[in-house]
Amino acid sequence: MVAQTPSSPPLWLTIIYLLRWHKPAGRLILMIPALWAVCLAAQGLPPLPLLGTIALGTLATSGLGCVVNDLWDRDIDPQVERTKQRPLAARALSVQVGIGVALVALLCAAGLAFYLTPLSFWLCVAAVPVIVAYPGAKRVFPVPQLVLSIAWGFAVLISWSAVTGDLTDATWVLWGATVFWTLGFDTVYAMADREDDRRIGVNSSALFFGQYVGEAVGIFFALTIGCLFYLGMILMLNPLYWLSLAIAIVGWVIQYIQLSAPTPEPKLYGQIFGQNVIIGFVLLAGMLLGWL
């Protein structure tokens, strides 16, 4: 363990920083697809114990993903302005502590998974290698955000099967919506680090699409809309769902217009990430009310 100086935050707070639990937007944006799935599968509000299990599971899993990412990137993050103060990058925590925190998060997620259906449990097991592989994908795969999006999609599969015990056509449509949505907002997020990523030599979708990155984000959001439109049709949801989808479409169109500006403000990328949390909750409300 790295020695704490008088000016350092306490150990427990440094671990919170490592898990990124002090940044709720990143935790919520993983929780949202899981909540979409559990509410649609339950055709309304699911049992509160199950809802709590899913929420805590996504919190543990997102924390695990953040720690694993920082362990992979501990020698890269100090070279990036946005990430250089992360605990492992700043050497505020040792690698051994990081591994220990990751194992605790994994054990917590596994313990919660035992309360789910057998299919959900095995989907949780299948998700772990994808979560662990994502940081490595940045070194060898030109669009690592696709790996992250597939990892995000497991939240849909796990949560839906936790309610029904199986997967349906609607599950896979929602999975597709989640994958495309994640590709969209995480590509925007990666745009903030383009110059650092290019200098260091790691891959990102923002670099891969180059000057057409705004158009790529627009296509990802359009595909998300297509999946959500089809989902509403096959589940025969009521007009309240369609209202929420219309609001989401307006939000995504505005974001696309902002990204199409010749020189977007750097702060725009983080703002769009946060706006997608709001859009996700608007859609969640529509999915809940869509069964009335």
Curated annotation (Swiss-Prot):
- Cofactor(s) this protein requires: Mg(2+)
Catalysed reaction equations from the record: all-trans-nonaprenyl diphosphate + 4-hydroxybenzoate = 4-hydroxy-3-(all-trans-nonaprenyl)benzoate + diphosphate
Q: Which is an annotated Pfam family here? A: UbiA
Q: Which GO terms describe its biological process?
A: heme biosynthetic process
InterPro entries (alphabetical): HB_polyprenyltransferase-like, Prenyltransferase, UbiA_prenyltransferase, UbiA_prenylTrfase_CS, UbiA_sf
Keywords, sorted A to Z: Cell inner membrane, Cell membrane, Magnesium, Membrane, Transferase, Transmembrane, Transmembrane helix
What does this gene product do? Answer: Catalyzes the prenylation of para-hydroxybenzoate (PHB) with an all-trans polyprenyl group. Mediates the second step in the final reaction sequence of plastoquinone-9 (PQ-9) biosynthesis, which is the condensation of the polyisoprenoid side chain with PHB, generating the first membrane-bound Q intermediate 4-hydroxy-3-solanesylbenzoate.
Q: What is this protein called?
A: 4-hydroxybenzoate solanesyltransferase
Annotated organism of origin: Synechocystis sp. (strain ATCC 27184 / PCC 6803 / Kazusa)
